[in-house]
Amino acid sequence: MVKPTLVSNTIRAHRERAGLTQAELARTIGVTRQTLIAIEQQKYSPTLELAFQIARAFGVGLDDLFAYPTDPGGAA
């Protein structure tokens, strides 16, 4: 079983605001629709290169799309 990523994202919200379908955004960034779905559902973290491509597609920075918890493991 694939472990969900701790990285959250707002890709779906940005995509919907831009009026893009999953297929359109996937084509723009060069991935399959299934890959985009997995990223939007936080089941898969994109590579850094792909993350930049997604951010560029919306004209925003990485920190506008992705967030990582400040204490992901509950440090002792």
Where are these regions (language model features)?
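Short alpha-helical DNA-recognition segment
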Residues: 20-38
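Key DNA-contact positions within bacterial/archaeal DNA-binding proteins
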Residues: 34, 44, 63
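DNA major-groove recognition helix of helix-turn-helix/homeodomain DNA-binding modules
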Residues: 49-64
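Residue-level signal for the short linker/turn that defines the boundary of a DNA-recognition helix
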Residues: 9, 19-20, 46-49
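A short, Lys/Arg-rich alpha-helix, primarily the initiator
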Residues: 1-17
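Alpha-helical residues within the helix-turn-helix
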Residues: 16, 27, 56
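Short, charged recognition helix plus adjacent turn
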Residues: 1, 56, 66-76
